[in-house]
Regions:
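Short, membrane-interfacial amphipathic segments enriched in basic
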Residues: 1-5, 317
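Helix-loop-helix units of permease transmembrane domains in multi-pass membrane transporters
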Residues: 4-8, 13, 210-244
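Membrane-interface helix starts
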Residues: 9-27, 351-355
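Residue-level recognition of pore/gate-forming positions within transmembrane alpha-helices
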Residues: 25-29, 241, 359-363
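Secretory targeting signals
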Residues: 28-40, 46-56, 162, 166-214, ...
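Membrane-embedded or membrane-proximal helical elements that form or frame transporter/channel pores
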Residues: 33, 37-206, 388-400
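Helix-loop interface residues and adjacent transmembrane-helix termini in multi-pass membrane transporters
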Residues: 227, 347-348
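Transmembrane helix segments
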Residues: 323, 351-378
Length: 401
């Protein structure tokens, strides 16, 4: 039967209308890569630091300790000034070291000034303490008695904590910071997966396969008369259709990767990306405030939320592993789309009607589940998981699996 699958794939590739669709798909991908590559030159990994806020401290409790604290704050400000200059001059190693130091101190200060219980909110506090000792940084908790009023706002802790871990990873793996739109052999598959495939993949499946019902109708009538063959025929047709679409999706990506290797290499395969860990444990719904209220900070190939309470759930993952998970998502989504168009083509005798219903169903499901949608019912909406990159990397409301 694998011979039949191969025959089906070859016959699909030879069809003129399919070739036109594949060419248009490749043109869209190449155009996207050129746009992203151009955009990456205007972006910069450089980020400013907030520093240590002194609004909540007072010298009344201990003037001498207050003076020591202000001396530390001035040293931190000098570190920020030098680090920001390193960033502007693209001295990335010194810049990363500065970001680790300042982010660790910021995160520790947010812990000190917050009245939230440490065990409930301050994840990775042990990692931050380890980094503080490793980089020879002062312990800001000794200045806790200077605080007049503690705060309930812990969102900035999350951001600083992740920044510290992110830039420490870059330093220890001798990696240069890259931007959100960066394109090389390591990142090309992720960029295509999050910019093109969420919209184009269902269209590609529908347009490539909607004529299959008509072409196979006569064969199916003959197969019906042969006992035990019909199920195998349907099964192998499904397999060939899925493999055909996956071939159309993955072959160009593989070619792009091979072409880009001589220009930028593959060193970024170990580049860290942030992913949403709770999304790997099951259907997970983010109990957050809505995307309209979220400030996103770019951390390499991922965006990180400043004011989302779910940010502590973010962990670091090497890019090669992220790429494998995204590829798995593409396979699963393709299988779902092929099954749906196959069922509709069986139920409806008119190929145009089945295509229309296919697109309308997916369109309505997508409309019902935008990224800012807060209804838990959409946990079971398949189109909530249409953006493989965003589901995995934590800027969608729904976990990856």
């Amino acid at each position: 039967m694998w011979t039949y699958v191969l025959f089906n794939i070859k016959s699909n590739l030879k069809r003129k209308e399919n070739l036109i669709l594949v060419v248009l798909f490749i043109i869209c991908e190449i155009a996207l890569l050129f746009i992203l590559n151009t955009k990456s030159f205007t972006e910069s990994p450089y980020q400013t630091s907030l520093g240590i806020s002194i609004a909540s401290v007072s010298q009344k409790n201990d003037p001498k300790l207050y003076q020591e604290f202000m001396d530390e704050v001035n040293l931190i400000r000098q570190t920020i000034d030098k680090g920001e200059q390193d960033g502007k001059e693209k001295n990335w190693k010194s810049y990363c070291e500065y970001k680790v130091k300042v982010s660790v101190l910021e995160a520790q200060w947010y812990m000190v000034t917050s009245n939230m219980p440490n065990d409930s909110y301050f994840e990775h506090a042990d990692v931050l303490e380890q980094l503080r000792k490793e980089y020879g940084l002062p312990d800001l908790s000794q200045y806790e008695k200077l605080i007049v009023q503690k705060s309930n706002d812990i969102n900035l802790y999350f951001c600083s904590m992740q920044q510290a871990r992110y830039f420490d990873y870059l330093l220890k793996h001798d990696l240069t910071p890259i931007t959100y739109s960066y394109v090389d052999a390591s990142s090309v598959s992720l960029q295509i997966a999050r910019y093109i495939l969420p919209v184009v993949l269902p269209l590609l499946v529908g347009l490539l396969l909607f004529q299959q019902r008509e072409r196979r109708a006569k064969t199916e009538k003959t197969i019906l008369t042969i006992s035990g063959v019909k199920k195998k025929y349907v099964r192998w047709n499904l397999i060939s259709d899925v493999l055909f679409v996956l071939l159309v999706v993955f072959m160009p990506i593989l070619v792009y990767m091979i072409v880009l290797v001589p220009f930028k290499g593959v060193s970024n395969l170990i580049y860290p990306v942030l992913y949403y860990k709770p999304g790997f444990t099951g259907f997970h719904y983010w109990d957050t405030q809505g995307l309209d209220h979220i400030e996103l900070v770019a951390s390499g190939l991922t965006n990180m939320s400043v004011n989302q309470f779910t940010t502590p759930g973010m962990e670091l993952m090497p890019l090669w592993q992220c790429t494998l998970f995204v590829a798995f998502g593409i396979v699963m989504s393709t299988t779902f789309y092929v099954l749906l168009i196959t069922v509709l083509s069986k139920l409806m005798k008119n190929k145009y009607l089945s295509l229309l219903v296919f697109l309308v169903v997916l369109g309505l499901c997508s409309f019902a589940s935008p990224l800012g949608n807060m209804q838990k019912i959409n946990t079971f909406n398949p189109m909530s998981y249409r953006d493989f990159g965003m589901n995995l990397l934590g800027t969608s409301y729904f976990g990856y699996f």
